[in-house]
Curated annotation (Swiss-Prot):
Protein name, per record: tRNA N6-adenosine threonylcarbamoyltransferase
Pfam family, one: TsaD
Chief site of localization: cytoplasm
Gene source species: Thermosynechococcus vestitus (strain NIES-2133 / IAM M-273 / BP-1)
Cystine connections: none
Family (UniProt): Belongs to the KAE1 / TsaD family.
Cofactor binding note of this UniProt entry: Binds 1 Fe(2+) ion per subunit.
C-alpha cells in the first residue's frame, strides 16, 4: 500500500488529494470559474495568480481531510505536463518544496495519464488492456492502455479538441463560460435533428475517411455561418435546437471512432476520460452503440471527469510501485507526448523496498 499526496494545477483548477493506491482519502479542488467568467475563457496570468493564492490552503485541506500527517505520506506527485506553463510551475514548485522539506520522493505525472487513471478510481478492479476515449478542453484522443506508462495512440483530433469546440460554439451562441456544461443543458431541451451539421471527417490521400482521426474546426465554422444566417432571419436564435444539433454531431463523431477502434483492435472495455466525459449526449450515444456489441463502458463519476488531483495520485501510486522517481530539477512543460513520459523519471528505476 502506498499513500500519495498529489497536486494538480495544469489549467484553472487548484487541486490536491491524498490517494492510497486506488482509494481516495481526500480530493480538494479550488475552482477558478468565477475569476475567468468575465473574460469568456481561461486567462493564463489570472490562472497563475489564483493558483498562487490557493495552493497552500488546498494542500493543507487535503492532508487534514485525509486524517493523516506528513509521516504517513510516501511520495509527492504533481502534474508537470502538458498545460499552461505558469499554472504548472505553481504546482511543480510547491511539490518540489514539499519533497525537500519532508524528505519524500517526487513523481512528475503527465496530465493525460491522470485522466486515464480516473477510470481506475471509478473501477478499482479494472485491468489493462483497455481503450480510453480521452475528451477534454485541450485534448481528444483514442488511447490503448496496456499498463502503467504503456500506451498507444490510435486517433486524435487534427485541430480543435472536442471541449474546445464546445466552448467556442457556446461563445458564438452567447451562452457564456464555461461553455460545455451550459451547451449540454440547452441541448437536452432541443431537437438534435433541427440542423444538419458536418461530422468532421479526415480525408486520406486515397479518398477514404480516416477511421479514428477527426476535425472539429469545420464543424465550428459551420455553426458560425449558421448562427450568422439565423440571426438575419429569426427574431430569436433557436439556441436549444442549435445546441442539440451540435452536440449530436460531436457525439456521433466521437462514438463512431471509439467503437471502430475498440472493435478493430479487440478491446473489450472502453473507458471515457476528461471533462467532456460528463456530457449527457456523448454518454447516451456511446451507451447505445456499445450495448449491442457487449462492450464494457466505464464512465468516471462527474467529479473525476474534470481536472482533479486524485487521478494524478492514482497514476503516481502505480509509478511509485514500479520504482519510478523524478529528479528535483523536474520542470513544467507546456507540451509532452503521452508516449514520452519516461522523460519525467530517472534513467534507472529505483528498487521498491
Amino acid at each position: 500500500m502506498v499513500r500519495i499526496l498529489a497536486i494538480e494545477t495544469s489549467c484553472d483548477e487548484t487541486a490536491a488529494a491524498v490517494v492510497r493506491d486506488r482509494a481516495i482519502e481526500s480530493n480538494v479542488i479550488a475552482s477558478q470559474v468565477c475569476a475567468h467568467q468575465p473574460f469568456g475563457g481561461v486567462v493564463p496570468e489570472v490562472a497563475s495568480r489564483a493558483h498562487l493564492e490557493n495552493i497552500n490552503g488546498v494542500i493543507t485541506a487535503a492532508i487534514s481531510e485525509a486524517g493523516c500527517d506528513w509521516s504517513a505520506i510516501d511520495a509527492i506527485a504533481v502534474t508537470c505536463a502538458p498545460g499552461l506553463v505558469g499554472s504548472l510551475l505553481i504546482g511543480v514548485t510547491a511539490a518540489k518544496t514539499l519533497a525537500l522539506v519532508h524528505q519524500k520522493p517526487l513523481l512528475g505525472i503527465h496530465h493525460l495519464e491522470g485522466h486515464l487513471y480516473a477510470s481506475y478510481l471509478a473501477e478499482p478492479t479494472l485491468e489493462p488492456p483497455f481503450l480510453c476515449l480521452l475528451v477534454s478542453g485541450g485534448h481528444t484522443s483514442l488511447i490503448g492502455v496496456y499498463g502503467c506508462g504503456e500506451y498507444q495512440l490510435f486517433g486524435q483530433t487534427r485541430d480543435d479538441a472536442a471541449g474546445e469546440a464546445y466552448d467556442k460554439v457556446a461563445r458564438l451562441m452567447g451562452l457564456g463560460y464555461p461553455g460545455g456544461p451550459l451547451l449540454d443543458r440547452w441541448a437536452q431541451q432541443g431537437n438534435p435533428e433541427a440542423f444538419d451539421l458536418p461530422e468532421g471527417n479526415i480525408r486520406l490521400p486515397d479518398g477514404k475517411v480516416h477511421p479514428y482521426d477527426a476535425s472539429f474546426s469545420g464543424l465550428k465554422t459551420a455553426v458560425a455561418r449558421l448562427v450568422a444566417e439565423l440571426r438575419q432571419t429569426h427574431p430569436e436564435l433557436p439556441v436549444a435546437d442549435l445546441a442539440a444539433s451540435f452536440q449530436k454531431a460531436v457525439a456521433q463523431a466521437l462514438t463512431k471512432r471509439a467503437i471502430a477502434a475498440a472493435v478493430d483492435h479487440g478491446f473489450k472495455t472502453l473507458a471515457i476520460g476528461g471533462g467532456v466525459a460528463a456530457n449527457s449526449g456523448l454518454r447516451q450515444h456511446l451507451t447505445a452503440a456499445a450495448e449491442p456489441l457487449g462492450l464494457r463502458l466505464i464512465f468516471p463519476p462527474l467529479r473525476l471527469c474534470t481536472d482533479n488531483a486524485a487521478m494524478i495520485g492514482c497514476a503516481a501510486a502505480d509509478h511509485f510501485q514500479r520504482g519510478d522517481r523524478s529528479p528535483l530539477d523536474l520542470t513544467a512543460r507546456s507540451r509532452l507526448s503521452l508516449l514520452e513520459i519516461s522523460a519525467l523519471y530517472g534513467p534507472t528505476p529505483l528498487a521498491v523496498s
